[in-house]
Amino acid sequence: AKIALSGVTGKSQSLQAGKLTLELDARQGETTVKGNLASPLAANLEKQTVELPSFSGELNVANPQMPMKSVKLPLTGGLRADIDGQTAALHANTQFDESRIAAKVNVSRFAPLALVFDLDIDKLNVDKYLPPKPAAAEGKEAGKPAPAEKPLDFSPIKGLNASGTVKIGQLQVSNVKASNVRLEVKAAGGKLDVAPLSANLYDGS
């Protein structure tokens, strides 16, 4: 990652920058992540607070295993962090394909990470991003039971304590369509719970 500041003013304990720029270029396995971000910056070294009042940029993620191969996400929003108090607040907006997404995150502890969030998506067609199901095999292969699915690995979120709400205006999964979907999500102790609070089915589904 590369970070640059321009238009820096202020005293030793408090400074402002007209523009902070961040460039990211990372790779893990087959996944590559490239991005850039720009924002004014306000920092108080004595109080250990940092604020990016208005950032914008984009994030590009590519992996040959993804149905779309690569995804470009425009980003806008703002961030404020209190390093000493271990709190932060983030609001961000992006667009993934035909989905407009707005997120709010409030962090109450950095380590181990604890946060609450709200995620609002206007519409999402999950079927569009899933790989096609293989055609049924013929003859003896057709009579064989399908291989057991591997259990999901939640070890990466073992130390995470998070809760929040996901709202989706229009959702399609396995050709089932629903509107005004509201989900409650909780992650703690390496477990992930997703509970539907409400949803309206439509189009005869």
Where in this protein do the model-derived segments appear?
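Membrane-proximal interfacial segments on either side of biological membranes
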Residues: 4-88, 97-195, 199-204
